[in-house]
């Protein structure tokens, strides 16, 4: 609950990093605050082993999905103030993913307190800038520097491991795969003219042209999702924002307009495959409308990722889960973005497993509408699974 009480929106993770570093240092870990950018440190702590064993990295992001003071978000699950009720913790970051970080921290504290000696090192890293945000147009600065900013810095500035466990919310399921994401901007031009003459022959309304493109994208999206079904899930296409015209001067014909599309991708897809599909839609609309092809740019390309389920990290996590819970965990694919993409790309095979993701009965079936919350019982389960997995992995010696 202490972590939830520390506000840590993207770009303002410093206080959370300081808290995590203090806890790790108190437990006897060798700690450092790794400055990613001014005022944005990753918090890293290592419990060194005797040497010669496999090294394990627990990791998770410290930034939260929201600031906690948005007027359009009400309820205790959207605020940086923890509330405990009926065995559940409610508050911003409770599920995504301070609960996972807390469970990993408790597992390391237990190993350190018991004086357990392992051949391998165990590291815990709380990272900045994971939330799905990206700079575009006037939206610039640290607040928009998400999508793996901290994890990429962590990996490329000296933190290594044989395997990683990412404590993202998975409802206590072992995940070996993650969808990727592309954010695209599609823009059209129009005629600068007074609105009173907007219907003159030859005048083009950019918003009307965007409307035709939007209709075509909505027609294309279901087929895209079906063609790329993977591990029982289908990647979504979401028209997430639209912009055009002069809101302060409606007496002017819209001479520019854009729509912004979130396209989820699955392992095996490449960004240029998606670009070709989108351009085919735009070219078809241009031909039907006898207009120039709309401009298409990508400003996020977060690739999908997939690990062989037979890799030791996945098998060990499944075994640990079964030993703790008595139930099997078949590998699943996660739909939202996650930093496992970056660890896998840098040859640190990363399993994803965390206590968040379950919904309290008060929340119905959709946490994003009710606010974040997590079961303490599920946190205890995750901490035990992390402990068992760490003991197994860090006791192994490479062949």
Give the residues covered by each predicted segment.
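Acidic/His- and Gly-rich active-site-bordering loop/insert found
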Residues: 1-94, 113-118, 357
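Residue-level signal for inorganic ion chemistry
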Residues: 3, 7, 168, 210, ...
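Short beta-strand segments
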Residues: 59-61, 125-127, 165-168, 187, ...
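Short glycine/proline-enriched loop/turn "hinge" motifs that connect secondary-structure elements
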Residues: 73, 116, 175-181, 250-254, ...
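Short, conserved micro-motifs enriched in small and acidic residues
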Residues: 89-102, 115, 204-207, 373-380
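Acidic/histidine-rich catalytic neighborhood of metal-dependent amide-processing enzymes
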Residues: 97-179, 398
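Metal-dependent amide/peptide-bond hydrolase catalytic core
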Residues: 185-399
């Amino acid at each position: 609950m202490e972590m939830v009480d520390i506000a840590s929106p993207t770009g303002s993770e410093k206080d959370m990093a300081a808290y995590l570093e203090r806890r790790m240092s108190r437990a006897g870990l060798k700690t450092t605050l790794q400055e990613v950018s001014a005022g944005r440190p990753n918090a890293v702590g290592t419990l060194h082993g005797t040497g010669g064993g496999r090294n394990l990295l627990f990791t998770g992001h410290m930034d939260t999905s929201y600031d906690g003071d948005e007027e359009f978000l009400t309820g205790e699950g959207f605020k940086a103030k923890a509330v405990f009720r009926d065995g559940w913790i409610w508050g911003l970051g409770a599920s995504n993913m301070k609960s996972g970080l807390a469970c990993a921290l408790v597992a390391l504290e237990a190993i350190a307190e018991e004086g357990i000696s392992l051949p391998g090192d165990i590291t815990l890293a709380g990272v900045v800038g994971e939330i799905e945000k990206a700079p575009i147009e006037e939206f610039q600065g640290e607040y928009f520097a998400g999508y793996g900013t901290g994890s990429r810095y962590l990996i490329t500035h000296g933190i290594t491991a044989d395997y990683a466990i990412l404590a993202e919310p998975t409802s206590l399921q072992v995940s070996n795969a993650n969808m990727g994401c592309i954010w695209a901007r599609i823009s059209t031009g129009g005629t600068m003219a007074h609105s009173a003459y907007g219907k003159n022959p030859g005048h083009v309304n950019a918003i009307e042209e965007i409307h035709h493109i939007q209709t075509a994208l909505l027609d294309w999206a279901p087929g895209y999702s079906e063609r790329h079904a993977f591990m029982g899930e289908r990647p979504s296409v979401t028209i997430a924002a639209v912009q055009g015209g002069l809101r302060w001067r409606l007496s002017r014909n819209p001479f520019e307009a854009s729509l912004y599309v979130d396209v989820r991708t699955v392992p095996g897809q490449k960004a240029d495959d998606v670009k070709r599909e989108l351009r085919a839609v735009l070219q078809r609309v241009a031909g039907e409308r006898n207009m120039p092809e709309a401009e298409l740019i990508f400003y996020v390309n977060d690739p999908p990722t997939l690990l062989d389920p037979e890799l030791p990290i996945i098998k060990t996590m499944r075994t640990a889960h079964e030993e703790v819970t008595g139930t099997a965990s078949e590998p699943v694919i996660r739909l939202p973005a996650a930093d496992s993409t970056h660890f896998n790309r840098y040859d640190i095979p990363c399993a994803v497993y965390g206590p968040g993701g379950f919904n309290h009965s008060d929340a119905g079936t959709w946490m994003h509408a009710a606010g974040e919350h997590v079961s303490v019982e599920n946190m205890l389960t995750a901490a035990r699974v992390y402990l068992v997995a760490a003991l197994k992995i860090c006791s192994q010696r490479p062949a």
